[in-house]
């Protein structure tokens, strides 16, 4: 049947342009081929947006899922494909479907499984991390300026430096009251690990770069993991558990420390990325003895981070 009425093309009652209109929470199964490796299967959640001029009542909403479906099918035919590349292709296709749009944006989040082993026993377990891919496009005349988005979110453990120092002071006071000499106290302090409270830390890094630059998602995952007090694991035998607790308490970190460490490692790792690369670094620590959670964030360009770090060398 040919539908004669296209309400979306009507003029709106209130003629105001809209920054982003689209669909969210759109779930799709994505299969990424890899050269000489098994494909990666991802259950991904998409957000897809275009801008809307003041002269048009609505976007053609059903075109967004249609575009995603088509790009996913095409990705199955290629030898190798990445999340952000899929998103770039979706953005290009959105401009074809929404001829009135001058801006388009796609963001996808997926659970990504890696096989990792525990630190002492070497037991393998499946570890799940969140990975993000995306793209933004701005259309000027017939040219489309693209940027791509790559990111990850990883869970780890942090140990509070403040509480640990309080416990250390209490121990020193108790040892002095029991008659230990300063020399003996120093030997004892060097031999023991002081208690503190822990948090489950959630670290996130998202990079937005011009098209043409490649970022390996595992590099981002490793940076986040190494920036907390210790890594967590799906399987821990007794020796592993002791090791993780010991390592986390030997490496106490505030939520602020985690963000600064991630920023430093991003600068060190991604020397090939241009200064205009946008960087979002975020850490949330879920407190164990407080009713609140701790939060820290850094938003900057890679060039700003480089200059800030150089100024203190």
From Swiss-Prot:
Gene3D superfamilies xrefs: Urate Oxidase
Top-rank taxon: Archaea
Known regulation of activity: Inhibited by GTP concentrations greater than 0.3 mM and by 2-amino-5-formylamino-6-ribofuranosylamino-4(3H)-pyrimidinone 5'-phosphate (fapyGMP). Partial inhibition is observed when 2 mM GMP, dGTP, or 7-methyl-GTP was included along with 2 mM GTP.
Keyword Lipid metabolism attached: no
Annotated pathway: Cofactor biosynthesis; 5,6,7,8-tetrahydromethanopterin biosynthesis
Cofactor entry: Fe(2+)
Cofactor note: Binds 1 Fe(2+) ion per subunit. Mn(2+) and Zn(2+) can be used to a lesser extent, but not at a relevant physiological concentration.
Activity at various pH: Optimum pH is 6.5.
PANTHER family referenced in this protein's UniProt entry, alphabetically: GTP CYCLOHYDROLASE MPTA
Record's function text: Converts GTP to 7,8-dihydro-D-neopterin 2',3'-cyclic phosphate, the first intermediate in the biosynthesis of coenzyme methanopterin. It is also able to utilize a variety of GTP analogs as substrates, including GDP, beta,gamma-methylene-GTP and GTP-[gamma-thio].
Additional information: MptA is the archetype of a new class of GTP cyclohydrolases that catalyzes a series of reactions most similar to that seen with GTPCHI but unique in that the cyclic phosphate is the product.
Family per similarity comment: Belongs to the GTP cyclohydrolase IV family.
Record protein name field: GTP cyclohydrolase MptA
Source species of the chain: Methanocaldococcus jannaschii (strain ATCC 43067 / DSM 2661 / JAL-1 / JCM 10045 / NBRC 100440)
């Amino acid at each position: 049947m040919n539908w004669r009425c296209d309400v979306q093309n009507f003029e709106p009652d209130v003629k105001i342009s809209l920054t982003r209109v689209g669909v969210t929470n759109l779930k799709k199964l994505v299969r990424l081929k890899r050269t000489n490796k098994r494909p990666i299967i991802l259950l991904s959640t998409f957000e897809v947006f275009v801008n809307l001029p003041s002269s048009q009542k609505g976007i053609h909403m059903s075109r967004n899922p249609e575009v995603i479906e088509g790009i996913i099918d095409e990705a199955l035919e290629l030898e190798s494909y990445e999340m952000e590349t899929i998103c770039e292709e979706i953005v290009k296709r959105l401009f074809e479907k929404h001829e009135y749009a001058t801006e388009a944006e796609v963001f996808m989040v997926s659970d990504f499984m890696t096989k990792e082993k525990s630190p002492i026993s070497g037991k393998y377990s499946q570890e799940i991390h969140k990975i993000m891919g995306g793209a933004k496009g701005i259309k000027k005349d017939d040219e489309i300026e693209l940027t791509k988005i790559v990111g990850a979110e990883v869970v780890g453990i942090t140990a509070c430096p403040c509480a640990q120092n309080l416990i250390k002071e209490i121990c020193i006071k108790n040892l002095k009251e029991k008659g230990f000499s300063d020399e003996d106290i120093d030997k004892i302090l060097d031999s023991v690990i002081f208690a503190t409270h822990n948090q489950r830390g959630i670290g996130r890094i998202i990079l937005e770069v011009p098209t043409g630059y490649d970022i390996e998602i595992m590099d981002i995952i490793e940076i986040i993991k190494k920036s907390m007090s210790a890594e967590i694991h799906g399987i821990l035998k007794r020796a592993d558990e002791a090791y993780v607790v010991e390592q986390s308490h030997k490496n106490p970190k505030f939520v602020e420390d985690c963000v600064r460490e991630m920023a430093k490692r991003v600068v060190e790792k991604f020397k090939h990325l241009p200064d205009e690369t946008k960087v979002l670094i975020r850490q949330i620590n879920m407190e164990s003895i407080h009713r609140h959670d701790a939060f820290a964030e850094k938003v900057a360009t890679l060039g700003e981070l480089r200059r800030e770090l150089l100024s203190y060398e």
